């Protein structure tokens, strides 16, 4: 620590979440001013020459590890502390600042903060600790009491005597660790408290310290700080009623400024330095603390993992064939090498812990993925049942997972069934102790679009202005305002219109300038998707805990206050329990298949033992691009790729999963051409053939780069992994060193420097985007399993797929289309046949799930099914309502089921069932009341399932088809009894030439491609004309509208922007049939296709305006034919479309054909109702409208 006489001991950072704009560097090196992306606490402290700092965020230690590491990097002493809100029934909540004297103090503070989050939730929000808790955990902590304390509150109320007694009480607790905080930031009440504090300090010998209660870095940040406070509190900056709690003086002042500010109280300055010298926390970073895994008494962790691994390998090899070219001895040698490495690095316990909870999960029937990440390259992991993919057949490398030349913690990422993942986490908590197991925190930040909207709101700007600016920010993941303004490293994401508006409009300048000051600040805390830590001791001995609260105000589901990187820094071992919905789909499908197999006495399907060379799966699913709903291969782009590549072996799937990413995607045409012999496969060196043969001479995987370094450059695989990492970082000095090593190794194999450099350059190029083969192989196995199920058991697979996304109507509709493409029958929901989920009732039939009806909850569905299974089918609406309790079955749910067609069996028709509903509900409510009061005379004591009352219920004619279809659309998200577009289909298709089904749209885009493995020539958009019924309209401000078109064969989302909206916006309304012209493109983000509208026409108006002639063939020999036809035509006159009638008449010489043209006053208006009436007349045998559409004029 330098000789400066002042140290800031009270600083809030962004991690206080509501009242600070001070950034904490994410990486230690960003503490240097020249390396900081934006000014942060440490970079500013370096500029000011501050010797030490204390971070004291409100009720948390979120920032501690990041702050600690960054401070040490630049030689600033880090002091750990926190502001605590303290609450007791007799007084309003008040504040106290605690600083850690040492590591023991840190543990006490950690305990105290954790207790606050677990037990101290306040009804009005936030948490507070009780004063007694502070007394229980005060040791090795220093306390700062200022004007926000209870003493400050009492003083403000004129009770100096009670205020002094308060300080005396805390002096008794903290002794010489108590300090009184003096501030001079221009806020109300400061000077009276300062004078009081100085007086008490003199009397009681309590030291005073100077503080600036820091909230922002520089004085000019005050507006941004106030904006942040307003965002958090939901207020506006110019709201005269909002509290003005802060002042523009609360910035990180220099020591000189503080010295001038407190020149009259030099002790207050000196005492900060003295206190800082007494704070000597030393965080124990970089050492791992594994939980204690129990082994038998006569075993050690190392002997036990060896024993378990060898036994596991033997069991595996009894069921699985050896890899081609490998012997049993090869397997044992590889196993021993891995075990030696694991034991030497001290990770036996880690492997055993992971194996234990995975094996437990499998014993419980919980679906678990075959592997994820580089862990799939470990033979020990396969032997211990951690993974389900033998690494040897696919040349997967253990060193990619655990490098003996680079000590780092192994990291198994485990995929679990989404439905049952929490069961495994609960098992781990029970086994190791709930106080030692926790999930991990994650922090949300103020992202570009969101912060613009937030700032616009607190500035009081019109919504239209703010919305229009936010929409100009590209939707690229992780984009910053700097990128959008063209100030990033590249201009790829620059928005020209945003830049233009920023330069031209003062309001936009103000909005974006303020938003950029707040962008990327931490704004909230949540739970990491899958991270779980297991500690050898209670977690609070390593870090504090954070928790949301339940309805009783107690903390629930605690998480660590350190994020996934920081928990590892303090030695906690992280395990990733990830949820993968595909595993749930596979599990549901296999259970349904085996249920059917059991009824038919057929052996069950074992999804883990599938042959990976099933020809129908490759031919009918992968090579044909029939991969909708197939894991990783669903997108339209991937389906096109599959049709080109025509994979016919598992290795191809691994490669395609790895290649279908930005960067390596450019290699796909070459890969495809080489696979099919259109191009020659060339290897950089003959020795690399075995490494590259599965990918036809192309480097696709990181493992291939490592093996090239080993075979050509003489590296060990451990060293090769270090080379791969170095190539990814592209540090010139490090690369030059490795190039020389590679040359020397290659020379030993007889290769000259020129050729060695050529291969090194090739490796360096591919290392930049090479994929992890272990991960690709494990996930390709899951893909293959879904494809195999789709090919051999399509009904069960599609039923499971539909069930997995029942709450997502758009996905349900898409999957139903795919089911029909597979020639599966989908039966409407039916209370006498449907379960909660979709079910395969036969090999070619799926029964709609009741749970997919909007407005019908799971508990209702389960009650319906349970009652039906116990007491038989429902026979009437009354029977149904009396058997399913009203508490679960309300009127809204009943109406939804009627509209969905689920109650069709219970009455004459839907209209009748709906008509009967009020009387049935009234009767069942009466029955319920009388049963509750014990009056059984009316209803008797009938057994469940038997009618208990008879009503004379009315019936009526069925609703019109349009009403039925609308009801289905509202409750199911789709039309079941037909489609409103059906009457128009023939005429519209003659106009536009195609439907909206996926294959038709693929053909349109596919016409832009050259085949035979040549490089694609895809255009960003393909101009086309489509038509459909508008089923939804979604507006984004005044400049963008999204409409979804359907035609009963498919659907597409169309977008219209300001240029099109000005001319055609009035046409974009629901239930209108539109013909649209625009740019068709593949929607890689959401899957499927989208179209940007440039022109559109109302179909009905187009018929009227552009029909050139109506052609009719009429048989006048039928009775009164002409009278009927003429009467129909008369109702559509006057009009602009002439007619040509091909007439068939009787004459004395037999049938005679003739033609009659009608025009002028005999012309008609072309409307769909006219065409419908004419088509229904028995005398009309042919009808056609000739158009001259506007797009061909």
Swiss-Prot record:
Subcellular location: Cytoplasm
Gene3D superfamilies registered for this protein in UniProt: 1.10.150.870, Bacterial DNA polymerase III alpha subunit, thumb domain, Metal-dependent hydrolases, Nucleic acid-binding proteins
Main localization, broad class: cytoplasm
Keyword Transferase on entry: yes
GO biological process: DNA replication
GO cellular component: cytoplasm
InterPro entries per the UniProt record, alphabetical: DNA_pol3_alpha_NTPase_dom, DNA_pol3_alpha_thumb_dom, DNA_pol3_finger, DnaE2/DnaE/PolC, DNAPol_HHH, NA-bd_OB-fold, NA-bd_OB_tRNA, PHP_dom
Top-rank taxon: Bacteria
Reaction catalysis annotation: DNA(n) + a 2'-deoxyribonucleoside 5'-triphosphate = DNA(n+1) + diphosphate
SMART domains, sorted: POLIIIAc
Keywords, in A-Z order: Cytoplasm, DNA replication, DNA-directed DNA polymerase, Nucleotidyltransferase, Transferase
EC id: 2.7.7.7
GO MF annotation terms: 3'-5' exonuclease activity; DNA-directed DNA polymerase activity; nucleic acid binding
PANTHER family: DNA POLYMERASE III SUBUNIT ALPHA (PTHR32294:SF0)
Family: Belongs to the DNA polymerase type-C family. DnaE subfamily.
Subunit structure: DNA polymerase III contains a core (composed of alpha, epsilon and theta chains) that associates with a tau subunit. This core dimerizes to form the PolIII' complex. PolIII' associates with the gamma complex (composed of gamma, delta, delta', psi and chi chains) and with the beta chain to form the complete DNA polymerase III complex.
Purpose of the protein: DNA polymerase III is a complex, multichain enzyme responsible for most of the replicative synthesis in bacteria. This DNA polymerase also exhibits 3' to 5' exonuclease activity. The alpha chain is the DNA polymerase.
Name used for this protein in its record: DNA polymerase III subunit alpha
Gene of this entry: dnaE
